[in-house]
Structure formats: structure tokens, C-alpha cells
Amino acid sequence: MSRLDLRNGSVEMVHGSGGRAMGQLIEELFARALRNEWLDQRNDQAQFELPPGRVVMATDSHVISPLFFPGGDIGSLAVHGTINDVAMAGARPCYLAAGFILEEGFPLADLARIVESMAAAAREAGVPVVTGDTKVVEHGKGDGVFITTTGVGVVPPGLHLSGDQARPGDRILLSGSIGDHGVTILSLREGLGFEADIGSDSQALHGLVAAMLAAVPEIRCLRDPTRGGLGNTLNELARQSGVGMQLVERAIPVREPVRAACEFLGLDPLYVANEGKLIAICPAERAERLLEAMRAHPQGREAAIIGTVVADEHRFVQMETPFGGSRMVDWLSGEQLPRIC
């Protein structure tokens, strides 16, 4: 049997049949790129030891369009997104599983590029992909490739971060500028050209989280503002904790190209997706120390204290404008940017 034609070949239905062709796809493409001691065993599952602590599991499905974009692709995004979901519990991400839905006719060169990007992201993060699965659907029944990743991590004993832990008086911190990922994807999709000055912020944040917890173990909540952006995520946290939030608009970092693109497109950057930022809520007396720790880390250099948790039975999120007024930051109504991750 000849080797896979990774330059000119494409995915065929036989690649999902469970036979020799599927084995060849796994061996010559997936296993070669993602190689590690668990995958090398060629079992249908991975067996591993975990350090002491509570086990955290998160799963995420990725349907982003386009598949490739400045700052990443669906492969690296699948790794980063799931690692970040695990890390927001304060956990150390340990292992990943990946499932691929491939469309018949999808170029093998593009698939190889995606898998190699996934492998590079996993290596950089130190979180291996230890098991996986591949299915093929008929041409026209998919959209190239969809990826589902599941992550397993461990929370150290004594640590408990949750979205229901915010208390009145706490400070709200943001790790950096918002809207980069969403504007990049929309601009590329519509051929607007803004992505040349921006690029996705997709990155794994567990290193930043570890540095933050080492400095301020009293952190109450962590959350990454992905779909729905900062505005939706803060409403989620307010609802979970039964509190209100008061933001300061001028304190929220937004890069000028993102601000300009949002004004042109009629978007509010508060609701534009991010893939490499986090929100932290901590006691007021520890906020400056946490800010210092975040800014000392490469992924938190633009960090800012953006608001305060307040007592509010209605659980409203409100924002002070630069002109001294106040406006409601409500839940996003409808879908502002579909297939953003």
C-alpha cells in the first residue's frame, strides 16, 4: 500500500472505515505528529496517574470558520480552549483527548497542517494528547473538519475556585485587551483586512494562572471570556454569585485597531470573543498584589482592575462611562459572531 499523499491527497470515506486505510491515516499523520508514550501504545484508551487533588474535566467542540487565521488555526485553538477551561478551576492541566470529524474531500495537506499545529500547541503547553478518535462524513455533510477536545487536570488540595464565590467589595481584574480574536475571525471571513493589524489572542493560560495563584491564593473566581465576550461572561458570574458588578469603561483595555474595527462594523467590543484572556475576582485588599503578579507575566502585561463586585439582588452588570454616566451591560441578545471558536 502506497504512502498517504499529504501534498495532493484528500480525505476519503475509507479513512473512517476502521480498516487499513484508516490505520494508515492514523499512523502516517496523527500518530506521527502527536507522538508520545501513551499514543505509542496504540490502545483505544489512555491509562495514566494523576497527582493528589480533585480531578477537573472539561470538553469543548470547535467549529471555527475559517480554519486558519492570523495567530492560529482550529488545531491550536482546540488545545488552548480546553486547557483554559481546565485552568480556570485553578487546575494543572495534565492530559488531552481529541476527536476529529472529517469531511470527505478535505485536503490531507490542510489536515496535516492542523494536526501539526495541535501537536506544537500541546508540546508548548506541556499537555499531551493521549487518546483520540476520527470519523469521516460524506462530502457536503460537514465543513472540512470539526474537533472536540477533552482535558483532564488536577486542582491542588485546599484550593476552590468557582463562579459562585464572588462577594460584594471584591475587585474584578482582566488579563489584557479584549476583542482581538473575534475581530480577526470576522474580518478574515468577510475580507475586510482588519486582521492584518490584529491577530487572534489564542493561547494557553495555565502558566499565568499558576503565577497568579502563587501570588494570591485567595482568588475567588477565574473565567475566560470566550463566546459572548467580557459582557456575557461577567453576567454569568454575577448570576452564579448572586451579586451585581460595577465596571469602569476607561479601565477596560481595548487595542486601537480593535476599537476602530468595532466602530466600523457596529460591534461592541464587550461582546466580542477572546481566546487568550481571563477574568479574575479577588478580595479588594489583594487586588493590587494580584495585578502586580499578572503584569509580571508575559500573558498579563496589559492587565487592569476594571471594576468592583457590589450587592445587587437584581444581579445587574453596570458600567461607568468616560463621561460620568452609567449604562447597563446586559446579556448579549442573539448571535453577534457565529462559529467564532
From Swiss-Prot:
Organism superkingdom: Bacteria
Residues annotated with S-carbamoylcysteine modification: C341
InterPro entries recorded: HypE (IPR011854), PurM-like_C_dom (IPR010918), PurM-like_C_sf (IPR036676), PurM-like_N (IPR016188), PurM-like_N_sf (IPR036921)
Catalytic reaction(s) noted: C-terminal S-carboxamide-L-cysteinyl-[HypE protein] + ATP = C-terminal S-cyanate-L-cysteinyl-[HypE protein] + ADP + phosphate + H(+)
Post-translation changes: Modified by HypF, which adds a carboxamido group to the thiolate of the C-terminal cysteine, yielding a protein-S-carboxamide. The carboxamido group is then dehydrated by HypE itself to yield a protein-thiocyanate.
GO molecular function annotations of the record: lyase activity
Pathways involved: Protein modification; [NiFe] hydrogenase maturation
UniProt xrefs under NCBIfam families: hypE
Function: Involved in the maturation of [NiFe] hydrogenases. Along with HypF, it catalyzes the synthesis of the CN ligands of the active site iron of [NiFe]-hydrogenases. HypE catalyzes the ATP-dependent dehydration of the carboxamido group attached to its C-terminal cysteine to a cyano group.
Species this protein is from: Azotobacter vinelandii
Family: Belongs to the HypE family.
CDD domains: HypE
Keywords per UniProt: Lyase
Protein name: Carbamoyl dehydratase HypE
Lineage: Bacteria, Pseudomonadati, Pseudomonadota, Gammaproteobacteria, Pseudomonadales
One Pfam family matching this protein: AIRS
